[in-house]
Amino acid sequence: MTRLTVPDPDERGDLGAFVARVVRLDQAALVRLRAGEGTVTAWAATPFDVLATRTVHGEVEPGDVTVPATGLLTALTVERADSVDPGAGGLWQGELPPAEGWQPVDDVPAAELERLTERGLAVARENAGPMGPPASLLDQTVLTVSAGARPAVKVPLRCLFALSGMGFLGDAGPDAGVVRVSATGSWMRLDARYGAVVRRRVTALPLLVG
């Protein structure tokens, strides 16, 4: 039987808020729960082709399970117990980023990202089609972050939309803090106050079979 245990009620509430945002963006979304050393990390895909993640203290058994977001949300918000059955039956599509090898690049004021997001939303509304904003707009680099001799990290608009859509920036006023940009050779990560978004920096090449 699948069990998710998050003893701290505040952290259960944080995880519930994370899952609620996931469901609001996509009713059919899945959440992948992975156990760490005394922690549980939740992963979800967003409509922006960006992963969202949040870590809380707790346990999950089995240690790597994918569940429907709606069922997990019900378990967290209705049962309100330390330990709940998060459901089962999900099949995760795609890969997750590595757990190690991340290098911090720089900290960016959350208020600055909020301003960039608002400008991006205005442009997206002007250019939205039947399927929403075009991919070319979402892929536009809106922020370039660099440190020392390391390659610059180019942050596309879709990452900011994911941060905003998941509510990770919170109240992005003057005292909203910073968003930490980290990277590996092929992934980028933006850690904000209430969660993080992750996206591949390098698109995997298709395998051609002759």
Question: Residue spans of the language-model regions?
Answer:
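Long, compositionally biased intrinsically disordered terminal regions
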Residues: 72-210
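A broadly used, surface-exposed interaction patch
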Residues: 51-84
